[in-house]
Amino acid sequence: MKTYITLTIYLLYIVLLFNCKNEKQETVVYNKPNILFILSDDHTSQAWGIYGGILKDHVKNKNIKRLANEGVVLNNAFCTNSICSPSRASILTGQYSHINQVYTLREPLPDSHPNIAKTLGDNGYQTAVIGKWHLVKQPEGFQYFNVLPGQGRYWDPILKSKDNWKDGHDGSVGKVHKGFSTDVITDLTIQHLKQRDVSKPFFMMCNFKATHEPFEYPDRFKDLYNDIDIPEPQSLLDFGKGTGGRTFVGQKLENLEARWEEAYRRPNEFWTSYPGLPFEKEGLDSIGLRQKIYQKFVKDFMRCGATIDDNIGKLLDYLDEAGITDNTIVVYTADQGYFLGEHGFFDKRLIYEESLRMPFVIRYPKELKGGQRIDDIILNIDFAALLADYAGIEKPNYMQGESFRENLKGKPPKGWRKNMYYQYWLHEPKRPAHFGVRNDKYKLAYFYGKGLNKYGASKEDTPPTWEFYDLQKDPKELKNVINDTVHQSIIDTMKEEIKKLQSQYNVPSDVPHFE
């Protein structure tokens, strides 16, 4: 009898233990996948650690590697206009900037403009966006939103919701959330997911401010990299226009140091603050100064990026705890690339590889085999079409991009693009407006140098110039070979490809043409 009672108690204990373990897990009652779309700002591929490069052994990337090992990595994902607001608009709409009307940094999406959140919401999804929005007007298509005003701030961020919305980048309205921005946005995302209707699939955008300038970080990472020197890019000591045939000055690292100086001297007047000031530079020549700027800049950038990796881990752990990992598509990407000292630059905007390239990883256990890499050319205008496809929705007519669902399984559709078209509109003399085309071997760019009356663009035109790079022989784009006769037939072919793509994507007629 004692044996029977003991066995009964033991079995009851096992049942209770199992139930306690699973009390937070959800029962999936819908047949469409959840979508968690994690979007960071400027977190460039050089700083992910899964794309190789000089920083791969230094970045903190445990959870990014986890996603890559469990999902599919895109080796050739590119943005179509490398700057924050336009790229975000293209991700949402599946359209080039000249179609969705977000060319620069202050334009909103037009009222009632279609986007993937609206499309998913109309097809049974709960839609939400938390974090950076940067599209001026109130988000449309998102049933719930809680977003930063403009760029927002890293510490104790203000977020705006339907209850306190005001158009623009005004941070005087909204609610203050104590803590570091990346941590706060993650916690709010998880909180919202816990409170949602579990009988419906969700589309959640978790948008980090990091790693945007000024590259701040929480105290837990302040000593990271203190005792080491970070390797330098090959072109760090490129000091200006004419180097390797480059036709413009660019955003030099010394301009970042000038911002540090101004922020330190006028903290109440400058537009932001930076960690780790003052920056001492006495006694340094131009080479020593640039090297020292680079070390501070890239260390701050990677410390800021470390918080993203931490919080990706928190999001993945939540999905596991809720029991919805298998039925949830997780995407992590950045809105564009970023220069980390290459060509002596910081910032983005250009058709050069570091700026053009978007890091991208996707996990969907039900369909995608982990640890795979895809070399096909994928654009940010394709992301919306992919999500619609996974949701069982025929691609809407408003989208210019294409679903790459089959590409992710190693089966690219017949006729998949071999060339991609890029156009940057926010003209200024040191970084002229330009368009171009890239394929797996070459890149051709036309710096037409006109603002075309776009918001914030300079009215000072620059002479039109061409740049051409052989990406197989010169992957770092150190030598513009536009005038090499050996390449002329290829250049002529690519010029025709530009015209073809401009026609295909309905590029406006006021964009400068060439013969």
Please state what every model-predicted region is.
Residues 2-4, 8, 20-466, 475-496, ...:
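Formylglycine-dependent sulfatase
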Residues 8-16:
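Bacterial N-terminal signal peptides
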